Design a protein with these regions (language model features):
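Aromatic-residue-lined binding/catalytic grooves and analogous aromatic/hydrophobic interfacial grooves
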Residues: 4-161
Length: 161
């Protein structure tokens, strides 16, 4: 989806906050006459990260997102989730390393989501929720199933749950 570059947008009223009671970090700002809010938290027992972007005007969220990973990873789309898999080697410490898998579910309130291997496009959404889970084989050889199940279970809940 075509979007404006973030460098072209003027941002005012930028504010960061942290609620220790609710364990939620948030950022709010105004751009183009629209008030936006981003909220972030890690949930237990779901063991996922949740990021939510909302706007005070309908159909105000249009954007493209991609991954810029520090490690070599294979990217794919599976079950409407962006999936990245790979292995991290530690050559200084001998052979071995850990295999990893990460999944990102993108849930848009209204609007359209276009998911491709290169990233995700969101068009005219009222709100967007990202659910992120990353697992390694360090503790469990079944890390891929745990990762997929974690995102799937969390995505089945409403944001308020």
């Amino acid at each position: 989806f075509p979007t404006r570059r973030s460098s072209d947008l003027k941002v005012t009223g930028y504010r960061r906050s942290l609620s220790l009671d609710e364990a939620v970090s948030s950022v709010s700002f105004n751009s183009g006459g629209v008030n936006y809010k981003r909220e972030y938290f890690a949930t237990n027992p779901d063991n996922v990260l949740v990021l939510r972007l909302t706007a005070d005007k309908q159909k105000s969220i249009t954007m493209n997102m991609g991954l810029d990973l520090m490690r070599q990873a294979d990217l794919s789309v599976e079950d409407n989730q962006l999936v990245f898999t790979g292995k991290v080697d530690f050559p200084l410490h001998g052979p071995g390393g850990v295999c990893f898998e990460g999944r990102i579910a993108v849930l848009a309130d209204n609007g359209e989501v276009k998911m491709e291997q290169s990233g995700v496009g969101i068009k005219e959404a009222d709100a967007v929720t990202l659910i992120v889970d990353v697992r390694t084989d360090y503790k469990s050889p079944d890390y891929k199933t745990l990762c997929a199940d974690g995102v799937k279970k969390a995505a089945a809940k409403s944001y308020d749950e």
